[in-house]
Amino acid sequence: MASEQSSPEINADNLNSSAADVHVQPPGEKEWSDGFYDKEVINGNTPDAPKRGFLGYLIIYLLCYPVSFGGFLPGWDSGITAGFINMDNFKMNFGSYKHSTGEYYLSNVRMGLLVAMFSVGCSIGGVAFARLADTLGRRLAIVIVVLVYMVGAIIQISSNHKWYQYFVGKIIYGLGAGGCSVLCPMLLSEIAPTDLRGGLVSLYQLNMTFGIFLGYCSVYGTRKYSNTAQWRIPVGLCFLWALIIIVGMLLVPESPRYLIECERHEEACVSIAKINKVSPEDPWVLKQADEINAGVLAQRELGEASWKELFSVKTKVLQRLITGILVQTFLQLTGENYFFFYGTTIFKSVGLTDGFETSIVLGTVNFFSTIIAVMVVDKIGRRKCLLFGAASMMACMVIFASIGVKCLYPHGQDGPSSKGAGNAMIVFTCFYIFCFATTWAPVAYIVVAESFPSKVKSKAMSISTAFNWLWQFLIGFFTPFITGSIHFYYGYVFVGCLVAMFLYVFFFLPETIGLSLEEIQLLYEEGIKPWKSASWVPPSRRGASSRETEAKKKSWKEVLKFPKSFN
């Protein structure tokens, strides 16, 4: 095999290829329509997956990290926006003047729009840019949407006393972040090894929580400025995050599924080999490429992918689309953005003079809790995570809302708040965020990223994710009005939603732990009952241990095992 190192220059040819001018000589003379992999080539033995030591795991996570960093963009916006709405200079530039108090303020409408315009852009961007993944490749599409994100940041920074210009910039900024919310989990799910797919897709959510945390820290650091640096510095830092993603795309392998769909089979082998740190001629690599190719050919026999295909009952795509839409909708109806968007305001209302500091505490809990999710999601399974998350968040939200309604203002809304009740609400908010960050926050993206056949994946993921941003817009815009009217009774609305989430997951969402993307297709086609799906074994593995057993066998000692050269 010969390979030439490609130029680091960012262009379509570079980003659409995992390794330029690479030639792979497959065993035998078979065409790809029949498959490269042949059991006779390896003496009738099915090739084993490559064994990984610490270095192998490290390489996989480092290669996937630049893709997952796309989650940092919406997280950063959530973190800085929560601080902006309480900054004096920001309110002076984009708010209204109240003569009775001599202060600037943001009306409920303007505050709601400030929070929600980003979500509007994201919902449009996710649908509008998803098609680029099929025409230009996943990596180049990500670079394009990140450039759009940078344009939106420029418009925001240049705004001066023109709230409508700032909002336009916020929408364009959201277009790019929305594109990332579809394209990044898509690419992660397609390059990740099956046994690590859940954890690697969870990195997207981990970076979102990292963005929220650093966003809180940023506005905490600039809040004492008296000029526009108070909010322009956090917005300006967006360019640094965007450049990290763009440069990172030079290192990430292209999706082997996209390459095979484009008849670039040899490059697909190189992509699989790169992420697994083996030779492109390894029999296991050829077998993986052959399985992907078989899935692509099977999808082609069903005809060209169209928007109409999303409503197909025969291939169970409609069922999966409904699941994707509802899972992304439920992700917002957990009530998490009630805390993340308005956390600073909420904790001022419970008697804390510096809500910025409390937001940093919440951001820290959110970030480190998501690290736990990355570590365990491929051992516990999707259903168990979601069911536990819905039940535990329900309990936390009931307590939070009840304390707010019954105990926070013992002498009425016009009287002083109870410090003890306020502290208890903060504690249960932290419990709630822990439960959310370890379950629904990462797993919702995993479910959507791995549920759809490659032929309709970009369309189905874009629609599912658009509902996430749509509900984020609705919650972000209407929360100031609702809390102003019913105060902490608002928490009971989310409790009802959490009950519905638990029931839906139990009766309608199948378990996909340990399955390849092609095997998930078979799971849906066989119509397995969701509550029995954890014990389902794909045809190629029948007679072996169940998927849950195999996942549990992999101890953390094995995952963190150092190669001999390290000992």
UniProtKB/Swiss-Prot annotation:
<feature type="compositionally biased region" description="Polar residues">
    <location>
        <begin position="1"/>
        <end position="19"/>
    </location>
</feature>
<dbReference type="GO" id="GO:0005886">
    <property type="term" value="C:plasma membrane"/>
</dbReference>
<dbReference type="GO" id="GO:0055056">
    <property type="term" value="F:D-glucose transmembrane transporter activity"/>
</dbReference>
<dbReference type="GO" id="GO:0015795">
    <property type="term" value="P:sorbitol transmembrane transport"/>
</dbReference>
<feature type="transmembrane region" description="Helical; Name=1">
    <location>
        <begin position="56"/>
        <end position="76"/>
    </location>
</feature>
<feature type="compositionally biased region" description="Basic and acidic residues">
    <location>
        <begin position="545"/>
        <end position="555"/>
    </location>
</feature>
<keyword id="KW-0677">Repeat</keyword>
<feature type="transmembrane region" description="Helical; Name=7">
    <location>
        <begin position="337"/>
        <end position="353"/>
    </location>
</feature>
<feature type="transmembrane region" description="Helical; Name=2">
    <location>
        <begin position="113"/>
        <end position="133"/>
    </location>
</feature>
<feature type="topological domain" description="Extracellular">
    <location>
        <begin position="219"/>
        <end position="232"/>
    </location>
</feature>
<comment type="similarity">
    <text>Belongs to the major facilitator superfamily. Sugar transporter (TC 2.A.1.1) family.</text>
</comment>
<feature type="transmembrane region" description="Helical; Name=8">
    <location>
        <begin position="360"/>
        <end position="377"/>
    </location>
</feature>
<dbReference type="GO" id="GO:1902341">
    <property type="term" value="P:xylitol transmembrane transport"/>
</dbReference>
<dbReference type="InterPro" id="IPR005828">
    <property type="entry name" value="MFS_sugar_transport-like"/>
</dbReference>
<dbReference type="GO" id="GO:0005351">
    <property type="term" value="F:carbohydrate:proton symporter activity"/>
</dbReference>
<feature type="transmembrane region" description="Helical; Name=9">
    <location>
        <begin position="385"/>
        <end position="405"/>
    </location>
</feature>
<keyword id="KW-0812">Transmembrane</keyword>
<feature type="transmembrane region" description="Helical; Name=6">
    <location>
        <begin position="233"/>
        <end position="253"/>
    </location>
</feature>
<dbReference type="GO" id="GO:0005353">
    <property type="term" value="F:fructose transmembrane transporter activity"/>
</dbReference>
<dbReference type="Pfam" id="PF00083">
    <property type="entry name" value="Sugar_tr"/>
</dbReference>
<dbReference type="GO" id="GO:0015797">
    <property type="term" value="P:mannitol transmembrane transport"/>
</dbReference>
<feature type="topological domain" description="Cytoplasmic">
    <location>
        <begin position="449"/>
        <end position="465"/>
    </location>
</feature>
<feature type="topological domain" description="Extracellular">
    <location>
        <position position="487"/>
    </location>
</feature>
<feature type="transmembrane region" description="Helical; Name=10">
    <location>
        <begin position="428"/>
        <end position="448"/>
    </location>
</feature>
<dbReference type="InterPro" id="IPR050360">
    <property type="entry name" value="MFS_Sugar_Transporters"/>
</dbReference>
<dbReference type="GO" id="GO:0008643">
    <property type="term" value="P:carbohydrate transport"/>
</dbReference>
<feature type="topological domain" description="Extracellular">
    <location>
        <begin position="406"/>
        <end position="427"/>
    </location>
</feature>
<dbReference type="InterPro" id="IPR020846">
    <property type="entry name" value="MFS_dom"/>
</dbReference>
<feature type="transmembrane region" description="Helical; Name=12">
    <location>
        <begin position="488"/>
        <end position="508"/>
    </location>
</feature>
<keyword id="KW-0472">Membrane</keyword>
<dbReference type="GO" id="GO:0071944">
    <property type="term" value="C:cell periphery"/>
</dbReference>
<feature type="topological domain" description="Cytoplasmic">
    <location>
        <begin position="192"/>
        <end position="197"/>
    </location>
</feature>
<dbReference type="GO" id="GO:0015578">
    <property type="term" value="F:mannose transmembrane transporter activity"/>
</dbReference>
<protein>
    <recommendedName>
        <fullName>Hexose transporter HXT15</fullName>
    </recommendedName>
</protein>
<feature type="topological domain" description="Extracellular">
    <location>
        <begin position="161"/>
        <end position="170"/>
    </location>
</feature>
<dbReference type="GO" id="GO:0008645">
    <property type="term" value="P:hexose transmembrane transport"/>
</dbReference>
<keyword id="KW-0813">Transport</keyword>
<dbReference type="InterPro" id="IPR036259">
    <property type="entry name" value="MFS_trans_sf"/>
</dbReference>
<feature type="topological domain" description="Cytoplasmic">
    <location>
        <begin position="254"/>
        <end position="336"/>
    </location>
</feature>
<feature type="region of interest" description="Disordered">
    <location>
        <begin position="533"/>
        <end position="555"/>
    </location>
</feature>
<comment type="function">
    <text>Probable glucose transporter.</text>
</comment>
<feature type="transmembrane region" description="Helical; Name=11">
    <location>
        <begin position="466"/>
        <end position="486"/>
    </location>
</feature>
